Amino acid sequence: MAKFIFITGGVVSGLGKGITAASLGRLIKSRGYRVTALKFDPYLNVDPGTMSPIQHGEVFVTEDGGECDLDVGHYERFMDVNMGKGNNVTTGKIYSSVIAKERRGDYLGGTVQVIPHITNEIKSHIRRVAEDSDADVILVEIGGTVGDIEGQPFLEAIRQFKNEVPSKDDVLFIHVTLVPYIAASGELKTKPTQHSVRELRSIGIQPDVIVCRSDREIPKDLREKIALFCDVPPEAVIPNEDLGSLYEVPLAMEKEGLAEIVCRRLGLDSRTPDLAEWEALVQRAKHPEREVEIALVGKYVALEDAYLSVVESLNHAGIHNNARVRIHWVDSEKLENGITPEALEACLGRADGILVPGGFGYRGIEGKINAIRYAREKGIPFFGICMGMQSAVIEAARNLLGLSKANSTEFVTDCKDPVIDMMAQQKQVTDLGGTMRLGAFPCRLKPGSKAHAAYGTEVVHERHRHRFEVNNAYLERLEAVGLKAVGVWPEGNLVEVVEMEGHPWFVGVQFHPEFKSRPNRPHPLFRDFIKAALEYRAGKK
């Protein structure tokens, strides 16, 4: 029988429940157990695919094409386990399933209600993930904060779930809460935690472990106070103070004994964790030998979480290259409207590498094109992802081929030279949600290319999220001016990778390599991009 760990949050949102779940998953896996994770999001959207990145952060794409919450990315990176569509479920998805069953007559004319029908659907999904994953331990994160109206069905479902498992030792509840510091009085306050736990207990859930987030060390006497008022053992009050890196969190939690408490409470054999690789990783991250600066040119830079996996992939590559990656955030809109060469130089001149990530819509696109031209002409390492690659194609068409009206039909439907066009199979699609080219597809790389050298193999599988592609009608002319197609989808001759001939490192990819990077196994393209940026930096001195 699998074991289930339910993780809830209190006081405020954004405390790091996902990092807590991911870190604990890593610690349990390091003891030789199979783990997986499931995130419940209480919003009514069926998935985050159509949500604004500025509101929600990035959409993480799984191998099977699931458009998921960014916490699923944390799960994959920390646990080094591929997740799928089923590992992120929203209220919208639960209600859609229940309503579809009602329309089919599955409820035999019964009155469909939140209890038991919605809660049963939630519990059914938890069991399905357990069966499909064959994991020993399933970590289930409940999004939002205890007390939110939207989250009530999920909390009720997990309360019921505990009463339905064969043994009470099969379920454990962890509550992540805030212990704020009040500067005026110079004190850490436990009252918000007490009230949050009281709210949780009022619906029938008694936490077994309380993880206390704070910006500083929590003294022993305050931990004992929380234990007393919240009815948990003192050792089950786990401090989780701010650290220099996310990757330090598993080691900090191991030091506090979280995994041992969890294993003991769930009746799992105590095993010695194998964290040597993770410890070495953290040490390299804390003591880099050099620095490199990357200009990240995007339209969603107001919220850094919109590019979370890109940032983490840069960090992974930096760790591998013994370098601290400093990101210079550049709003692509500020590079538009006839920006002068001097202003462009002032904005991008200090960069050792320029990265243009994915995105949608025309806003900011001209600024991205200006940044790409700057990288191409100055010989600065460039990495374009999804729209970043498409922007590189438009830049080459305009400034090397002389097609001044070159554009994407995403922005100008009747443009004179549509060097980027909608994929044929997308032209009849009307709904936006879940209809893009999603998930992992093969790509065949050309030997001798930088991409082939990075991967060390001819066929790779990468994750996608797009509707538009390079228009092959322009490919021969683009290649004639130096923009080479060095990677294609074998089944449809779709251009997946382009490189600029004669440039030190200029690579654009249609896929999203950031979704497959791991702290201990950086993505080959990010690894080589940072290496090229370091070489460029060394050459400037």
Curated annotation (Swiss-Prot):
Documented EC number(s) = 6.3.4.2
Please list the reactions this protein catalyses: UTP + L-glutamine + ATP + H2O = CTP + L-glutamate + ADP + phosphate + 2 H(+); L-glutamine + H2O = L-glutamate + NH4(+); UTP + NH4(+) + ATP = CTP + ADP + phosphate + 2 H(+)
- Name one molecular function that GO assigns to this entry: metal ion binding
Q: Which InterPro entries does this chain map to?
A: Class_I_gatase-like, CTP_synthase, CTP_synthase_N, GATASE, GATase1_CTP_Synthase, P-loop_NTPase
| Binding sites annotated in the UniProt record for L-glutamine | G359, M387, G388, M389, Q390, E410, R467
Domain of life of the organism in this record?
A: Bacteria
Q: According to its UniProt record, in which pathway does this protein act?
A: Pyrimidine metabolism; CTP biosynthesis via de novo pathway; CTP from UDP: step 2/2
Q: Where is this region: Amidoligase domain?
A: 1-268
Query: Could you tell me which CDD domains the record lists for this protein?
Result: CTPS_N, GATase1_CTP_Synthase
One Pfam entry name:
GATase
Write out the residues that bind CTP: S13, D148, I149, E150, K189, T190, K191, P192, T193, Q194, K225
For the Glutamine amidotransferase type-1 domain, which residue ranges apply?
293-539
Activity regulation (UniProt): Allosterically activated by GTP, when glutamine is the substrate; GTP has no effect on the reaction when ammonia is the substrate. The allosteric effector GTP functions by stabilizing the protein conformation that binds the tetrahedral intermediate(s) formed during glutamine hydrolysis. Inhibited by the product CTP, via allosteric rather than competitive inhibition.
GO process terms (BP): 'de novo' CTP biosynthetic process; pyrimidine nucleobase biosynthetic process
The entry's cellular-component GO terms read:
cytosol
- Residues bound to ATP are G14, L15, G16, K17, G18, I19, D71
Residues the record lists as binding Mg(2+): D71, E141
Q: Which UniProt keywords apply?
A: ATP-binding, Glutamine amidotransferase, Ligase, Magnesium, Metal-binding, Nucleotide-binding, Pyrimidine biosynthesis
Show the active-site residues.
Answer: C386, H512, E514
For UTP, which residues are the binding ones? S13, K189, T190, K191, P192, T193, Q194, K225
So what family is this one in? Belongs to the CTP synthase family.
Please tell me what else the database record remarks about this protein. CTPSs have evolved a hybrid strategy for distinguishing between UTP and CTP. The overlapping regions of the product feedback inhibitory and substrate sites recognize a common feature in both compounds, the triphosphate moiety. To differentiate isosteric substrate and product pyrimidine rings, an additional pocket far from the expected kinase/ligase catalytic site, specifically recognizes the cytosine and ribose portions of the product inhibitor.
- Subunit details for this protein? Homotetramer.
What is the annotated role of this protein in its UniProt record?
Catalyzes the ATP-dependent amination of UTP to CTP with either L-glutamine or ammonia as the source of nitrogen. Regulates intracellular CTP levels through interactions with the four ribonucleotide triphosphates.
According to UniProt, the name of this protein is CTP synthase
